[in-house]
């Protein structure tokens, strides 16, 4: 049996969106999924526990088997938990070295210089290689691929000795093949004893990696689902008869009018040409398979730069 890391029994929490009742439990080297009925309320409040924004007001809390109060829990989370969410910190100036050293644990400045030496240690070099992150430390964050950015975030958690890693909805950001590569990096941390919470709305992802799924319904921990129960039982607990909640909504066909924008043979460096129309009364969806197209289109439309040839009409 794995050693317990953190446990909160009958925990009452207060956030800007109201009151919540959560039971939290995870052990060293354990990966637990958290599936919520409403991410904007319960999901945000639960996630904010690990960002220090949701306040523990009542209940019993334990860290490594020791009973602690609200202040002790807040301090433990601040020192031992790190959240990696789907938003990317894309700086044009900061490097990988800055990201690992300067942006983490600023309240432990005395550790900075020993950490600088550890960046080139055999252990750090080996971990980087095993994660597939073979780039110089001087590489700018903005020049990293989406996958490498998240690999670096996982490495940062390991390098700084965080005991609890929280991943928030990365299935909404990464392509499936890249997500599998990232989870290989997460598995390395699990084998080192790091505990991992997965916040996500992709049940297949949860079923694959979670040793348990905590189901949040009605602003409280409603049920704990174990692998032998994985499947339709999840949706039954959430009251989503017939499958996942989004399936209840029917597709609404929109009547598209005349084109308001026509793009022909738009070329960007290292990308195939693009041709598309956006019509009046239409919601256009552009799927970005290489993570760079969306940024380059943004620069093209709003920054008036970035393309090599093509025309608009």
Predicted regions and their residues:
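Helix-to-loop junction immediately C-terminal to a conserved catalytic motif
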Residues: 51, 302
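Conserved ABC nucleotide-binding domain
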Residues: 127-144
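Hydrophobic anchor residue at the start of the ABC signature
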Residues: 153-154
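Q-loop/switch helix immediately C-terminal to the Walker
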Residues: 87, 92-112
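Pre-NBD coupling/linker segments of ABC/ABC-like ATPases
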Residues: 2, 110-121, 224-262
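Conserved ABC transporter NBD signature motif
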Residues: 59-67, 75-78, 310-313
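Glycine-rich P-loop/Walker A and Walker A-like loops and their local beta1-loop-alpha1 context
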Residues: 33-48, 285-299
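H-loop/switch region of ABC-family ATPase nucleotide-binding domains
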Residues: 199-201
């Amino acid at each position: 049996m794995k050693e317990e890391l953190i446990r909160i029994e009958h925990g009452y929490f207060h956030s800007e969106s109201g009151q919540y009742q959560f039971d939290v439990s995870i052990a060293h080297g354990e990966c637990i999924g958290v599936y919520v009925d409403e991410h904007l309320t319960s999901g945000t409040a639960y996630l904010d526990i690990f960002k220090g924004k949701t306040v523990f007001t009542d209940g019993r809390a334990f860290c490594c088997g020791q009973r602690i109060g609200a202040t002790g829990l807040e301090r433990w989370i601040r020192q031992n938990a790190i959240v990696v969410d789907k938003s990317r910190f894309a700086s044009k100036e900061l490097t990988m070295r800055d990201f690992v050293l300067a942006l983490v644990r600023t309240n432990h400045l005395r550790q900075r210089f020993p950490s600088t030496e550890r960046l080139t240690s055999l252990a750090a070099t080996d971990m980087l290689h095993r994660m597939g992150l073979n780039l110089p430390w001087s590489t700018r964050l903005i020049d990293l691929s989406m996958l490498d950015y998240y690999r670096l975030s996982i490495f940062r958690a390991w390098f700084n000795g965080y005991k609890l890693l929280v991943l928030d909805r990365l299935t909404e950001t990464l392509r499936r093949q890249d997500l599998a590569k990232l989870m290989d990096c997460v598995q390395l941390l699990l084998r080192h004893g790091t505990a991992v919470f997965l916040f996500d709305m992709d049940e297949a992802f949860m079923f694959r990696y979670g040793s348990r799924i905590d189901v949040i319904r009605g602003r409280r921990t409603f049920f704990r689902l174990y692998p032998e129960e994985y499947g339709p039982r999840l949706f039954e607990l959430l009251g989503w008869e017939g499958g996942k909640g989004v399936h209840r909504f029917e597709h609404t066909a929109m009547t598209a009018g005349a084109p308001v924008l026509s793009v022909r043979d738009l070329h960007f460096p290292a990308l195939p040409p693009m041709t598309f129309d956006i019509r009046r009364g239409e919601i256009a969806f552009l799927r970005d398979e290489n993570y760079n197209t969306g940024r380059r289109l943004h620069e093209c439309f709003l920054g008036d730069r970035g393309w090599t040839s093509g025309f608009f009409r």
